[in-house]
Amino acid sequence: ALPKGFFCTADEALTRAQVEALHPDVILHTAALSDTSYCAQHPAEAYRANVELPVWLARAAQQTTAKLVAFSSDQVYAGVQQQGPLPETLALHPANIYGQYKLKAEQRVLELCPDSVHLRASWMYDLPGYGLPIRGNLPLNLLRAALKGEALRFSRNDHRGVTYVRQVIENLEPAMALPGGVYNFGSGNAENMVCTAR
């Protein structure tokens, strides 16, 4: 594992050197700048984190013969009008910068590393009790709003799965054996986010 915060200051050469020193069989890339509002306000920073960094890791994976498994996002589907399960082969034009950059990363990395695996993760959540920091997630946001008597806004046009992070972890090892490509990775959800939040 790389030190916490490593990618905040690393460049491509340092990234490659670290990967070469570790010489892993698999590179599991989970880092991202995923706050969609922040990405829209800071597109250069978002591009570096969400496109350049995965490309650097792809080049390092090529040189070390490591398999790259990278987390993408269901935000690549943002703006899709089609309802129901969405196939990975759907033509996409993401409605937000974060989704656009994650899609671009998938495409560029697959050009460099056709055997790389890209997991389009849904909105994940964890629960307190493991001694780990908990970021905002749907169940905790709903609980917090209910306790404070605050309203939350959701869109009927937003169709997303919501996945318990422990299920994601349990399925990571099998995902490492997948052939190169893009995969939806998480719980399905036939409802829009208004219905899901209720």
Pin down the residues of each PLM region.
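NAD(P)H-binding glycine-rich loop region in Rossmannoid oxidoreductase-like domains
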Residues: 9-49, 62
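Catalytic helix-loop patch of NAD(P)-dependent Rossmann-fold dehydrogenases
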Residues: 48, 52-56, 76-119, 124-125, ...
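Mid/C-terminal beta-alpha module of Rossmann-like enzyme folds, strongest
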Residues: 171-172, 177-198
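SDR active-site strand-loop-helix element
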Residues: 27-31, 68-74, 80, 119-121
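NAD(P)-dependent short-chain dehydrogenase/reductase
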Residues: 110-160, 166-167
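Conserved catalytic-core motifs of eukaryotic protein kinase domains, centered on the activation segment
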Residues: 37-44, 79-83, 130
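A short helix->loop->beta-strand "cap" motif at the edges of active sites that frequently abuts
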Residues: 63-67
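Catalytic phosphate/metal-binding cores of nucleic-acid and nucleotide-processing enzymes, i.e., regions
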Residues: 46-47, 82, 165, 181
